[in-house]
């Protein structure tokens, strides 16, 4: 058994490709625990900030902590479906799913991301 506690002031800032007007922070990495497969991040999107539509590299979960995020998912027929998410709402999608998001609210939105990496 292994574990790692991360305090808010220990979150690591990083640049997420295709993201704009956002502060992205990393809370946990797979190497934090024995046999780990989860990457956990917290993103702070300014109004109008978001991420361009792109295929997901991993299975992922978005959980909205505060604010409003419009998540766009592209189906197998290349049709876009938009979902307006608020605090407490979440979306779970598989690897390869084309997705994007945009803060369509008037305040900074906080979104917790969970990325599940396949085991090697």
Language-model regions: role of each:
Residues 26, 39-56, 95:
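Conserved short histidine dyad/triad with adjacent acidic residue
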Residues 1-39:
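A short, N-terminal "cap"/entry segment at the start of jelly-roll beta-barrel domains
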Residues 30, 50-56, 73, 82-83, ...:
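Short histidine-centered beta-strand/loop micro-motifs
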Residues 86, 95-120:
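Ligand-binding loop in jelly-roll beta-barrel domains
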Residues 76-94:
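Short acidic-glycine-tyrosine-enriched beta hairpin
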Residues 49-52, 70, 91, 95-100:
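Histidine-centered metal-chelating micro-motifs
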Residues 44-46, 56-71:
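Short, conserved beta-strand element in jelly-roll/cupin
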